[in-house]
Regions:
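Phosphate-binding glycine-rich loop
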Residues: 1-13
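Aromatic/hydrophobic pocket-lining residues that form π-stacking "cages" and hydrophobic walls in ligand
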Residues: 2, 24, 85, 113
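A short helix->loop->beta-strand "cap" motif at the edges of active sites that frequently abuts
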Residues: 12, 33, 91-95, 119-121
Length: 141
């Protein structure tokens, strides 16, 4: 919710994966942003079809949510996949928000968008102690 409040204004647009975590859309609606769903499909290894997304008018899109390892599909993204998504964000001046709480428990070597220096200005990554340290329900800070 706080990311939406910090980066969005009424009428801005947000790219939200389908299937995906419902809170991405809910938090965006709080600030009266418009939700644009992009489909994840097994034919594309549950990755965003960037060419399809790019065929739309993206001038009002401010945030694109991604989540890898993905829930609910369990799909994983490679560093190369994440680099393509980050490049897409930079090209269109879209903040890529990578909800990444499962990386530390589902990957042999956790992958981070922040490893790709060229795109750091257009990415934000979230992690969670509840997944990696079995702290579900704990509140810190």
């Amino acid at each position: 919710m706080h990311i939406s409040m910090a980066f969005l204004n009424k009428g801005d647009q947000v790219l939200v994966p389908n299937p995906g975590y419902p809170t991405y859309a809910s938090a965006s609606k709080i600030v009266e942003a418009d939700i644009i769903c992009y489909d994840l499909s097994p034919e594309n290894n549950w990755l965003p079809n960037l060419a399809s997304i790019e065929s739309n008018n993206l001038s009002k899109v401010k945030i694109m949510w991604i989540n890898y390892p993905n829930m609910p599909t369990g799909a994983n993204a490679t560093v190369e996949d994440l680099e393509k998504i980050a490049a897409f964000g930079k090209k269109h001046n879209i903040l890529i928000c990578h909800d990444n709480p499962y990386s530390f428990i589902l990957n042999q070597k956790p992958i981070s968008l922040l490893e790709i220096n060229e795109y750091k200005s257009h990415v934000l990554e979230l992690n969670s102690l509840s997944k990696s340290h079995n702290m579900a329900g704990w509140r810190l800070g």
